[in-house]
């Protein structure tokens, strides 16, 4: 700063030789700085207005022509701009369709914060309230310690002025003695803040996990609902940041409030001892603080929206990374690294642009904030400290003839000045933390919006209420699905039968509808009795796999009725096996009994010898010979495609359900092993519902369900010619 001042002085001296006074130069310099600040603040607003008007103007255009400046830009900039437009379009679409409230300091924020507070602190007497009580006690103790330390420092200066070595040494010992509890309390405040943050996060994580796995929400959120794009990011990063912000804000708001209240009382008492007016100083400080706070609130950027958008773009970047990891083999086969890297760069550039916007907004806001806090408030503090000395009733030294008494009064005034200065520094620090907390509260509003919004979506999807953005523009007038407030209503019913004599599955006028509300089959009515082995055929996209999702309860039923047997103890009604089976984290035993646990296996009295027999049925006994049942491996990479499919069949033989939903589950298995598997399944009394393109499996079924891809279907008994054809091909 001194170097800059010297540089300005030299320029001013040169200007004086040309007829400009130093005062005029300083005035011009300050005016230029204020003008630059005004331009910097107003330009983003003007750009925002122009962008909004241009979007409205171009909304009706359909030709999609590019401006000359866009044509002349580089390909990378053009693609980045297109990605930005797509992102803005998606956000506008979500606002228009879902009536979303923008994150900010509003009633919705208070409502969401209250909801999350009830989750973090579920009752009056719990672990979290205990932490809060101890934390609050430490904060109050720290305030009293600050006041006591300020008084000790004032006494130290007093005895230095008096040259009283004995009293100085005594007060200095007290000062060193108070340092031990003061440092302990400071450390405890940080420790309790961390513990409080972890406790809040644990409560939120447990509650959100409970919702996430309720009624298969983990599937519904990503496949049936379109409001949450990256649930994993919200469940991990957003909850963590929200919990940290709440715990930190409690300290940032509570401690300054205690400081201001107690320090204000201490200053008023000191002014009273100096026989000065105790109202003028506090009134002046309150007025200055209120005025500066109002100005900062007016010019404060919308940090809540900015932070929420930053978290959204960061979550999308993580999503791109995870997608590349998941599909690494396919990308490598296609040689699509250039496309993936380009998408990754675009996602990262969007995040960088948003972070740069936040940095730019913070630059000028923090500059103005520091001007008020460091200089305006410091000047006000100087006036507050000087008023009791200048306006006190006994301020003149010349009226007192006794030199000793005069020196005593000088030392007392010095003590007051030192104590008041230290207290004012603490008070200014408290006010600065309160003002800085406003930005943190606005940022907290963004994370509150995301976390509370996630839980609201979880609760709605658990009740069967879904919202897909692509549904809003089409399929709302199909006459089959009823919509309410832009959301499809599942009016169909699932009826569970407890009659042991009625173990059939029946669909009565049930439409096959995709998550986007596309009608695949308008009405499907059929009855599948035990022993009716059903073969399902038809072209791609005709509704074969969709039927399995409806039977399994993954997709909602928008009309009609689905009658299924109620699962009894240890005997599931249906067991679905996809073409690409899922291999869980665990041992070989865990792969066979999934989704059972070892405790479930022991309760069913199933031994390892029975598991070996099951592996032998699917020709996987060599795996048990190579590895024990307790060895934990990455089975997804160890097993081949055919071995994974046979492992899924082993799960079927372990659980022995009434009905097996087989979706191309043996496409990578040899024909002889496949035939053996189907024979064993029928011998166990499992009714087979099979989707396959292999005619060799026809002979294991009694009925056929044919879809034509146009919404029509036919359910009939398989004739002898079709059975003979299957036997001939096998």
Swiss-Prot record:
Organism: Drosophila melanogaster (Fruit fly)
PROSITE patterns: ABC_TM1F, ABC_TRANSPORTER_1, ABC_TRANSPORTER_2
Stated name of the protein: ATP-binding cassette sub-family D member 1
UniProt domain ABC transporter: residue ranges: 505-727
Residues annotated as domain ABC transmembrane type-1: 136-373
GO biological process, alphabetically ordered: fatty acid beta-oxidation; long-chain fatty acid import into peroxisome; long-chain fatty acid metabolic process; peroxisome organization; very long-chain fatty acid catabolic process
InterPro entries found in the cross-reference section: AAA+_ATPase, ABC1_TM_dom, ABC1_TM_sf, ABC_transporter-like_ATP-bd, ABC_transporter-like_CS, ABC_transporter_sub-D, P-loop_NTPase
Family in the record: Belongs to the ABC transporter superfamily. ABCD family. Peroxisomal fatty acyl CoA transporter (TC 3.A.1.203) subfamily.
């Amino acid at each position: 700063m001194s170097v800059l001042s010297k540089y300005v002085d030299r320029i001013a001296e040169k200007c004086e030789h040309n007829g400009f006074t130093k005062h005029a130069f300083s005035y011009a310099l300050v005016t230029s700085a204020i003008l630059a600040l005004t331009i910097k603040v107003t330009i983003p607003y003007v750009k925002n207005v122009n962008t909004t008007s241009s979007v409205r103007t171009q909304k009706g255009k359909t030709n999609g022509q590019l401006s000359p400046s866009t044509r002349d830009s580089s390909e990378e900039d053009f693609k980045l701009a297109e990605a930005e437009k797509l992102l803005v379009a998606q956000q506008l679409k979500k606002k228009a369709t879902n009536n979303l409230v923008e994150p900010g300091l509003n009633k919705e924020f208070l409502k969401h914060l209250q909801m999350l507070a009830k989750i973090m602190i579920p009752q009056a007497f719990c672990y979290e309230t205990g932490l809060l009580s101890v934390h609050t006690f430490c904060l109050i103790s720290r305030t009293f310690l600050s006041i006591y330390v300020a008084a000790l420092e004032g006494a130290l200066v007093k005895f230095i002025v008096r040259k009283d070595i004995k009293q100085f040494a005594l007060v200095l010992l007290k000062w060193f003695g108070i340092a031990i509890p003061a440092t302990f309390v400071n450390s405890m405040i940080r420790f309790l803040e961390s513990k409080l943050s972890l406790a809040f996060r644990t409560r939120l994580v447990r509650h959100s996990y409970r919702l996430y796995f309720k009624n298969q929400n983990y599937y519904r959120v990503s496949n049936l609902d379109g409001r949450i794009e990256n649930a994993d990011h919200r469940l991990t990063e957003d909850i963590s940041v929200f919990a940290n912000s709440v715990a930190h804000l409690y300290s940032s708001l509570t401690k300054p409030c205690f400081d201001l209240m107690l320090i204000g009382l201490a200053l008023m008492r000191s002014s009273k001892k100096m026989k000065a007016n105790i109202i003028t100083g506090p009134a002046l400080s309150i007025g200055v603080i209120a005025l500066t706070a109002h100005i900062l609130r007016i010019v404060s950027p919308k940090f809540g929206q900015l932070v929420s958008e930053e978290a959204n773009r960061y979550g999308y970047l993580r999503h791109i990374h995870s997608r590349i990891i998941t599909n690494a083999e396919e990308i490598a086969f296609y040689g699509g690294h250039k496309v993936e890297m380009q998408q990754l760069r675009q996602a990262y550039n969007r995040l960088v642009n948003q972070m740069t916007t936040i940095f730019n907004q913070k630059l000028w806001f923090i500059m103005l904030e520091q001007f008020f806090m460091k200089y305006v408030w410091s000047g006000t503090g100087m006036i507050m400290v000087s008023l009791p000395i200048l306006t006190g009733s006994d301020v003149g030294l010349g009226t007192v003839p006794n030199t000793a008494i005069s020196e005593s009064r000088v030392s007392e005034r010095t003590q007051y000045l030192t104590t008041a200065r230290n207290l004012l520094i603490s008070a200014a620090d408290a006010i600065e933390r309160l003002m800085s907390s406003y930005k943190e509260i606005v940022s907290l509003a963004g994370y509150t919006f995301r976390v509370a919004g996630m839980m609201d979506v979880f609760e709605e999807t658990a009740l069967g209420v879904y919202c897909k953005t692509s549904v809003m523009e089409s399929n709302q007038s199909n006459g089959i699905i009823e919509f309410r407030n832009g959301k499809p209503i599942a009016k169909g019913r699932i009826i569970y039968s407890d009659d042991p004599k009625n173990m059939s599955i029946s669909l009565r006028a049930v439409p096959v509808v995709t998550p986007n509300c596309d009608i695949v089959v308008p009405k499907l009515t059929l009855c599948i009795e035990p022993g009716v082995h059903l073969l399902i055929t038809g072209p791609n996209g005709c509704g074969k796999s969709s039927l399995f999702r409806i039977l399994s309860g993954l997709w909602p039923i928008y009309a009609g009725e689905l009658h299924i047997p109620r699962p009894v103890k240890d005997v599931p009604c249906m067991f679905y096996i996809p073409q690409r089976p899922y291999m869980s984290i665990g041992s070989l035993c865990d792969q066979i009994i999934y989704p059972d646990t070892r405790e479930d296996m022991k309760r069913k009295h199933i031994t390892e010898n029975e598991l070996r027999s099951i592996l032998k049925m699917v020709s996987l006994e060599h795996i048990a010979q190579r590895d024990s049942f307790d060895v934990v491996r990455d089975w997804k990479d160890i097993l081949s495609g055919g071995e994974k499919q046979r492992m899924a069949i082993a799960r079927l033989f372990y659980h022995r359900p009434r009905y097996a939903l087989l979706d191309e589950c043996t496409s990578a298995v040899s024909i002889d092993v496949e035939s053996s598997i189907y024979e064993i399944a029928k011998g166990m009394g499992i009714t087979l519902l099979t989707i396959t393109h292999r005619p060799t499996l026809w002979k294991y079924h009694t009925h056929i369900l044919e879809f034509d891809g146009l919404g029509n279907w036919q359910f009939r008994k398989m004739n002898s010619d079709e059975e003979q054809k299957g036997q001939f091909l096998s």
